[in-house]
Amino acid sequence: APNVNKSFKKAFPDAEDLSWYKYDKEYLAKFITKDMNHNTRFRQNGVMKYDISYGYEHNLPEKIKEMVNKVYDNYKITRAINVKVTERNIWVVKMEGMKKYLTVRVEDDEMDEVESFYKAETQN
C-alpha cells in the first residue's frame, strides 16, 4: 500500500532489516533502528496504530533511567520496551533484583509497578 510505505519511510528513515506482514486490512512492519527491534502496525491509509520497540537500559531516555534507578537502585534493568500508541508514549522497564523480578511502567513522569514476582528457590 503506497500510503503505508510513505508513512513508514517518513517515520523511520533509518530502518534496517525490514519485513512486512499483512493482517486483514492492516500492515505490520518488523525492523531494527538504533539497535532496537520494532513492531509497528499501520492502517491501510498509512496511519500508524502503534510502535512497540524492544531494547535495553542504554536505550532508555536519561530522565527515565534516573527516575527508575532512584527508586529501584538495587535492581538491574534487563529490558526497556517503548510503546507509542496515538498520543501516548510509555516505557515498560523490566528489572532483576537479588530475590525479585519487577516491571514498572513510566508515562508522563508517572511510574507504576505493574508486575513483581519472586525468583524460584533452587535446591542444589
Question: Where do the language-model regions lie?
Answer:
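Interaction-mediating elements
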Residues: A1-N124
